[in-house]
Amino acid sequence: YFHKVHAAVAGIFAEDIPPLLPGIPLAALMLYEFSLGLYVAKGNPKNISGIRDLTRSDVILANREKGSTSRIYLDKKLKELQISSASISGYQKEFVSDVSTSAFIINKNGDTAIGEKAVVLKTNRLEFVPLLTVPMYLVMETASLDSPGFQALIDIARSEEFRMSLHSQNCYDTTYTGELIYL
């Protein structure tokens, strides 16, 4: 951060944001919510239904890089379920996008990955096993809210045109779009 960024998009839960920027009063503008889940091959041939299936010896994971929404969720869930990452084949191999993890599965190099539903909607070779709904925020310092530029961003996020643009992509929930919360 180092006061070089005025706003950042964060696909994580609101309570996970303040520890990343300790001591800085923050505001988070809800952009949309999206479904995060498992990518599996068409027909789900290995019957993968949840995180515990990642420990099976016949399942290879295409993992995302540290700091990505998918990886943050996976690491939190593994800790919660007391599952060692060492028990997951493919955990150490990192990919930098949902598109690259999905290609790994389509090319039959792996069996599953965690990512957002939007990627699966662009191919007929994958299926999606939903795990949870994740918010996407625009995060900024509270002091910035009075700046004309930030007010313009808020106005855009609250506009019907913005909501319709998100709806047209068929994978984003705009129920809370435009809501501002203080962290």
Residue ranges and their predicted role:
Residues 16-25, 46-52, 79, 143, ...:
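N-terminal hydrophobic or amphipathic helices and topogenic motifs
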Residues 36, 40-46, 62-70, 142-145:
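Short coil/turn segments
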Residues 84-98:
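Short beta-strand-to-loop elements that line the ligand-binding cleft
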Residues 1-49:
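N-terminal segment of the mature folded domain
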Residues 33-35, 126-155, 174-181:
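Periplasmic-binding protein-like
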Residues 52-74:
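Short loop->beta-strand "edge-of-pocket" segments that line small-molecule binding or catalytic clefts
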Residues 4-19, 102-132:
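A ligand-binding cleft/hinge motif common to bilobed small-molecule-binding domains
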